[in-house]
Amino acid sequence: MQLTYFLFQVAVALLAIVTYILHRKLTYFKRRGIPYDKPHPLRGNMEGYKKTRTVHEIHQEYYNKYRNSKAPFVGFYLFQKPAAFVIDLELAKQILIKNFSNFTDKGIYYNEKDDPMSAHLFNLDGPQWRLLRSKLSSTFTSGKMKFMYPTVVSVAEEFMAVMHEKVSENSILDVRDLVARFTVDVIGTCAFGIKCNSLRDEKAEFLHFGRRALLDSRHGNLVSGLMRSYPNLARRLGLCRNTAQIQEFYQRIVKETVTLREKENIKRNDFMDMLIGLKNQKNMTLENGEVVKGLTMDEIVAQAFVFFIAGFDTSSSTMGFALYELAKNPSIQDKVRAELGQVLEQHDQKFTYECIKDLKYLDQVINETLRHYTIVPNVDRVAAKRFVVPGNPKFVIEAGQSVIIPSSAIHHDPSIYPEPNEFRPERFSPEESAKRPSVAWLPFGEGPRNCIGLRFGQMQARIGLAMLIKNFTFSPCSATPDPLTFDPHSAILLGIKGGIQLKVEAI
């Protein structure tokens, strides 16, 4: 009886402690006089997440409500974690560029011990991120992109052959699916040195596991919220982001590739070759003069994994959305094709590295696509030290507090981009771009922690789109969705329900 009473007292005490902690978290902004919406005890301000609303839609509604409030940031509850939701572009610039040293971390959950694949460059924080970024910085220079360029062109030529075969059978094609297969084959070749054959085989292993890595969730919303709100507790509990099948597949592929290349002394101008080179450097000197060890096998697996996943979905989505808009806007499509004809004439009708770089209007189309269809909805940061917003002493970002910069919402702010739902590549002419601060366009982040692979992603999209526009015309058909319906179940990245069916005709 006494034991039962004692256990009851312990349970009551624990409940009281948990309730107190939760209450303190959920009244964080109220106590500081910062504008915010009252949060749900578990979901915070993420109502409808993965059920009825995308993260983009959640952020857009919140941003629209407060964008005229004159507050540099407002309170937002990412589940139970209080975050500073940035409204003011000058504050975004302070965080991403001017005071970057105080906002280097992202605060995204990873578990290096139980799920080493999650400890990649996109997720890592602190000294680990700085060290790995320094190690990898040489792998994405313009010179290295030039080395990989012929490989991408080779896959693109195979893509054109497949497209001609498809068009001869049926002019109505799901372009979203086809560009996804193209990007899988490009990245599989460049990251793993493997011919994936996704273009011709719908059941190709790399395509299958690429989609599973994006769609399969190891945990439900409750546990996912725990991982975001209480990362240290989640690590103690051994919680992983990736499913066991995903981990096993990528670990096996990378280790087999590394072993084969080292055994047979295979050298290629690709990402995996660069990673192996970093692995075999017992000591390497960083830009700051520091001497460190090369990459471990776990680090190689993690970087190859994120290179594949990030490049696969972002590039294929961008290409698919661009083709959709070009089909709906034939005058823009014609302008891209006319520029392409002029540039190819200057380069002896060859898709050289310099030729692709000269396609300025195509770049504007890609940039406008990334604005209109922002794949990653926000930029995450965490304050290392207490930060008082300049000119607004009431607004303080405390040490350890999360920061959300809502990229997609900023991209649809009519005061920055008039009539934001209209597709206008001219917004990104040199003259128009110069009128906006750099942080008004954030598909790749900004500052020292921007996307390290943006050069590769842009190169892949330019080559794929340029060859498609040269060889085919695209137009809407009865099966073309209008408007596109976005899928709330796609977690973070911008996904759509169904495909993008267009009428495709060979030129």
Curated annotation (Swiss-Prot):
GO cellular component, one term: endoplasmic reticulum membrane
EC annotation from Swiss-Prot or TrEMBL: 1.14.-.-
Membrane topology label: Peripheral membrane protein
Binding site for heme: C451
PROSITE patterns: CYTOCHROME_P450
Gene3D superfamilies assigned to the protein according to its UniProt record, in alphabetical order: Cytochrome P450
Compartment annotation: Endoplasmic reticulum membrane; Microsome membrane
Cofactor(s) needed for function: heme
SUPFAM superfamilies reported for this sequence: Cytochrome P450 (SSF48264)
CDD domains reported in the protein's UniProt record: CYP6-like (cd11056)
Protein origin, superkingdom: Eukaryota
Record-stated family: Belongs to the cytochrome P450 family.
Role summary: May be involved in the metabolism of insect hormones and in the breakdown of synthetic insecticides.
PANTHER family reported in the protein's UniProt record: CYTOCHROME P450, CYTOCHROME P450 6A16, ISOFORM B-RELATED
Name used for this protein in its record: Probable cytochrome P450 6a18
Taxon lineage: Eukaryota, Metazoa, Ecdysozoa, Arthropoda, Hexapoda
Gene, per the UniProt record: Cyp6a18
